[in-house]
Amino acid sequence: MSTYAIIKTGGKQVKVEVGQAIYVEKLNVEAGQDVTFDEVVLVGGEKTVVGTPLVAGATVVGTVEKQGKQKKVVTFKYKPKKGSHRKQGHRQPYTKVVINAINA
């Protein structure tokens, strides 16, 4: 059974395994640098450890592969019969991280 962990980042919880690529909310880290996630909620494998609320001393290390933006989401509001309309777009920034190690 492979080791996995559940980490908290960007207001979300993400299940990760070594070698997996994950997309998280934008982190202020350059591409190619390592990033450490200290908020580990659960470490699973041969023996599962559940934190209360976090697992003490557990970290997950990954490498930032790239920074980018998601596809554009377009919102359009209008008032019928008034000739009033508003169009707005948004592209959410993200960071792609490849998980290197889970230290429990």
Swiss-Prot record:
The record's GO molecular-function terms, alphabetically, read: rRNA binding; structural constituent of ribosome
Can you supply one Gene Ontology CC term for this chain's record? cytoplasm
The protein's matches in SUPFAM superfamilies, at most eight in alphabetical order, are given as: L21p-like
Q: What InterPro entries does this protein map onto?
A: bL21-like, bL21-like_sf, Ribosomal_bL21, Ribosomal_bL21_CS
Q: Which GO terms describe its biological process?
A: translation
Keywords, in A-Z order: Ribonucleoprotein, Ribosomal protein, RNA-binding, rRNA-binding
State the source organism's domain of life.
Bacteria
Has keyword Ribosomal protein?
A: yes
* Similarity-based family: Belongs to the bacterial ribosomal protein bL21 family.
Q: What does this protein do?
A: This protein binds to 23S rRNA in the presence of protein L20.
Record text on subunit structure and interactions: Part of the 50S ribosomal subunit. Contacts protein L20.
Q: What is this protein called?
A: Large ribosomal subunit protein bL21
Its source organism is Streptococcus gordonii (strain Challis / ATCC 35105 / BCRC 15272 / CH1 / DL1 / V288)
The organism's taxonomic lineage, starting at the top: Bacteria, Bacillati, Bacillota, Bacilli, Lactobacillales
From the UniProt record, report the name of the gene that encodes this protein.
rplU
